[in-house]
Each structure stands twice: as C-alpha cells, then as structure tokens.
Amino acid sequence: MPYKKNYKRSAYNTLGYLGEVLIILFLKCKLYHIIKHRYRCPLGEIDIIAHKNKQLVFVEVKTSLFNKNIPITYKQQKSILKSAKYFIAFHRKFANYSIRFDLYFFSLSTGLIHIPNAWQES
C-alpha cells in the first residue's frame, strides 16, 4: 500500500511541475523574465518569481486534471508573502520594484485562469 500512496504523491508533484512549466512558457511569451522557479527559503516556497518593467511578480500555480478549482488558503498566502519579503531582503536590486501576487489555475477542462493581484499584503 505505501507504494501506491507514494506513487500518487509523485503523480501530483509531476502534474504540478508540468503546470508550473506551462505557466513559465506563458509568462515568457508575455516577455516576463523568469528569476526563480520553485524558490525555497526557510519561510516557505514560491512557485515562480518573474519580473517585467520594474514589476516583480510572485506566482502561485494550482494544477488539476479536471475542473477542480484548488483554493489557496490564507496560511499559504501568508507563507508566500513572508517568502517574498525574504527574497527581496536578499535580492536588493528588486527593492524598488512594485510587487504583485498572481494566481494561475490550470486544468484540462477549464484551461488557464489567471487572477492578477490575487491577494495583497494586509
């Protein structure tokens, strides 16, 4: 039984990774520069960090095979906010950039849904 559980987790990780790669290609087509993919720090993880025209975008990607909108929790939002602050603290060249937090949903049935400014620091 543990094999099936690990296999399922691996399949979800692969699906999530493919969704992130798709969004990276989408952002590159929109002329964004990708800074980091799967950025990790002691405070959390950010799927994609990109910039364009003095705007720094922190992206969360949710991927599903079917029409299943996967919510982003308040706890996840706070983790991404803290990780973004950590990133900027160690990459001072982005300190004067405007910041945006975007959310992308992707599924085979609904396609790509982009929510710019999905949340803000409160």
From Swiss-Prot:
A GO molecular-function descriptor: nucleic acid binding
Protein's recorded name: UPF0102 protein Erum0631/ERWE_CDS_00560
The family this protein is said to belong to: Belongs to the UPF0102 family.
Source domain of life: Bacteria
Pfam families: UPF0102
InterPro entries for this protein: Restrct_endonuc-II-like (IPR011335), tRNA_endonuc-like_dom_sf (IPR011856), UPF0102_YraN-like (IPR003509)
